């Protein structure tokens, strides 16, 4: 184990995306924070964070929560008034 110092943060995130993240975290027995740390650390190194099996689980969660957003949509999202 590597010792780290974590801080509490408040972020705003798209509602359906959060539902998918929470569902995946539960499937993997992780906190959402641990899941996000892993995804970001993999992305920083240009690596995929997920196996084919996990990607299939994500696809199912996206269907369940009607998440249609894709990578190309990032940085273009605007909150509804």
Please place each PLM-identified region on the residue numbering.
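Generic low-polarity alpha-helical segments
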Residues: 1-3, 47, 59
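Short, basic amphipathic alpha-helical segments that act as recognition/interaction helices
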Residues: 28-55
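Short interaction-prone segments
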Residues: 49-68
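Low-complexity, intrinsically disordered short peptide segments enriched in small/polar/basic residues
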Residues: 4, 8-10, 29, 36, ...
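A generic structural signal for alpha-helix starts
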Residues: 15-16, 30
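Generic leucine side-chain signal with a strong bias for well-ordered alpha-helical environments
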Residues: 17-21, 35-36
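Short Lys/Arg-rich basic patches
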Residues: 1-15, 22-25, 63-81
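Activation segment
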Residues: 21-22, 44
């Amino acid at each position: 184990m590597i010792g780290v110092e974590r801080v509490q943060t408040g972020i705003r995130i798209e509602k359906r995306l959060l539902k998918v993240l929470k569902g995946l975290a539960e499937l993997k027995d992780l906190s959402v924070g641990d899941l996000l740390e892993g995804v970001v650390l993999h992305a920083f190194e240009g690596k995929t964070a997920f196996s084919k099996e996990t990607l299939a689980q994500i696809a199912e969660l996206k269907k369940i929560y009607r998440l249609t957003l894709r990578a190309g949509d990032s940085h273009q999202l605007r909150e509804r008034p």
